[in-house]
From Swiss-Prot:
Taxonomic path: Bacteria, Pseudomonadati, Pseudomonadota, Gammaproteobacteria, Pasteurellales
Family: Belongs to the LipB family.
GO CC terms: cytoplasm
Keywords attached to this entry: Acyltransferase, Cytoplasm, Transferase
Residues annotated as site: Lowers pKa of active site Cys: K140
Cited PROSITE patterns: BPL_LPL_CATALYTIC, LIPB
Protein name per its UniProtKB record: Octanoyltransferase
Active site: C174 (acyl-thioester intermediate)
Function of the protein: Catalyzes the transfer of endogenously produced octanoic acid from octanoyl-acyl-carrier-protein onto the lipoyl domains of lipoate-dependent enzymes. Lipoyl-ACP can also act as a substrate although octanoyl-ACP is likely to be the physiological substrate.
Keyword Nucleotide-binding attached: no
GN (gene name): lipB
Catalytic activity: octanoyl-[ACP] + L-lysyl-[protein] = N(6)-octanoyl-L-lysyl-[protein] + holo-[ACP] + H(+)
CDD domains noted in UniProt: LipB
Enzyme class name: transferase
Amino acid sequence: MTDTTLIIRQLGIQDYQQVWQQMREFTDTRNVLTADEIWLVQHPAVFTQGQAGKPEHLLNPTDIPVVQSDRGGQITYHGLGQQIMYVLIDIKRHKANGSELNVRQLVTALEQSVVSTLADYGIKSYPKADAPGVYVNEQKICSLGLRIRKGCSFHGLALNINMDLSPFRQINPCGYIGLEMCQMADFIPTEQAQCDKVAPKLVTHFTQLLGYNDVTTY
């Protein structure tokens, strides 16, 4: 195992809390020989609050469960048709361009992976320095939230591909009042806006940016 070894796990549709617990257990038990991993998953409808989450950003409580998470950021929504990519990376071990990878570089790599993926579909997008994530025409298409423990990351990004966006209207997404959300299906044909088609492109861009060359998919 080297710094360029990566395991990709395709988890399908799984409960948020179950996967969150698995991420914590993986991070707590990994050691210097543990390969980095990417987990690709979709979650059934759930609101998640970040560590700094404020209850007033949940505007209209519904029957959608709310989970207090340990990631960074404020409240967001997960649902089917949204591709989630969790990144379980030993930051202190990984070398990027000859220097130690830091959290800011990891966030930038995640954002750039999304920007490049969207560009593959002709969608022009951009990150914001003061509001992590990726945007199209001032609407947010991808949310980011990480947790660092023992120098290792978990949690990751959520890219809206082809989903019901209406639950976002029940919250101030990421704590921003009036922030509008969008998805890939707003800009490209539905048959192209599918998680199983978009995810491989997203992973490819991310692995190239971080220099992984020994990649195994399960």
